Amino acid sequence: AQHLYRDKLLKDPYRPLYHYVIPEGMAHPFDPNGAFYWKGRYHLFYIIQTVRPKPFYRGDAWAHISSHDLIHWKVHPTALKPTDDTPERAIYSGNIFLNKQGIPTIMYQGLGAGNSIATSVGDDWLEYWDRHPDNPVIPYAEYPFDNDQAEYRTILDKLPDYGAYDIWDPHCWLEGDTYYTITGNNELWPGKDALFKSKNLKDWELMGDFFHHDPIEGTLDCPDFFRLGDKYVLLFLRNGLEYVIGDFKDEQFHPEKRGTMTWNIGAGYAPESMVDDQGRRIMWAALNDSRTSWGDVDNFITKHAWAGTLTLPRVLSLDEDNDLKIEPIDELEGLRYDPVIIKNLDVNGEVVLENIRGTSMELRMSVNPRKAKSFGIKVCASGDGKEETVLSYSPEENEFTFDLSKSSINEEYMEGYLWEKDKIQKAELTLERNENLDLRIFIDRSVIEVFVNKKLALVQRIYPVDEDSDQVILFSNGGSVQVPILESWKLHPSNPY
């Protein structure tokens, strides 16, 4: 059976080659967690679905991978999973930090129990974790899974403090000699993102609202909170990948700026980041596979044998105005081969790049688009125009557009996570007076990831059907655009299979 599953996933034309993918099996959700640099290796954990040990147990657990270069990954044994001896029914999101003794420590959401702690002592590979004997250190009620939301709310309303916080995707860090934990809200208590503090990781005090003002409305999923330069940054999932930049003072977060990476969820969700030995803040997010849904897990695995993809690692930094900069890691350049360079290209209307085509490649160019009403590039385009994914910029509207309306003639695949209003997604992008439009585009079978002027990092899943849907086309409307240089590379696969 294992061989048959492996054969299926190897034949899947939509399985990415250099974006990390689960070796096999189910990861839906595929939330990355516990990103941590330790003993010369990058460690990353993510949620997978395993065999359910008891009725009402989802079987969610933390898988574990590590790498020396952020590109090639070693698979480790499953790190945390629910068992007969643990109170939780599933292991949900959390993070890793160093405790006061310098020991790698996990705080995670244990479904049905609460926020819990585990530590890894004397293990360079971070494969062995000891749960805290007093787990859950921040408990919540154990409730029957067949209750509807109204009954669930009735149960929790009877508990102390349960109008003040909920257990949801904790994030813990050490500030000075004090541990702090965000435990996000859910839809029962919008705007209630609670902050706890502790001196010993066992006894926690509820401090109240995490936000000093302008709280996030609705759920605050997968929060990731860290210092960046002179500011603090909160990454989270709401209507897509979002972030808030501000200050943490007087034990509250004071928001100043808010931005978006993806819109209406789309492909990207569940941000997670770490700091490496070079001081880089490196971030990942999970990518939905829209060919499946929450209610179709078993059928999907039977058909495709896998589900779970991550974005490319991204480096986050702040510019002189404390605006967020986002760019791909330099290590990706080591995958390049078979370069093609085109110079001094005049684009007026459409120009098909005959010697650049493919479904696993990188494209890079810098242009001045101001003489046209819009300038862009079509990738994974078919010769008959029935399939194409369009990336374009309008100087007049100061908008960058990601148009997925013709990405696949298979509407069933595209409808998995997109609605009609989301198929053309627009992001605000204002170029300075002498600033060019700088594009880095990564195509990886069913993934398109676009970095624009280090200001935008957009990602989507596409599922072209036509074997001819590998063309690259430049275009301009309402004027001519000069392309001084366009570079392309094919990229070596980095996944073992």
Predicted regions and their residues:
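Beta-rich accessory regions
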Residues: 3-6, 249-266, 272-497
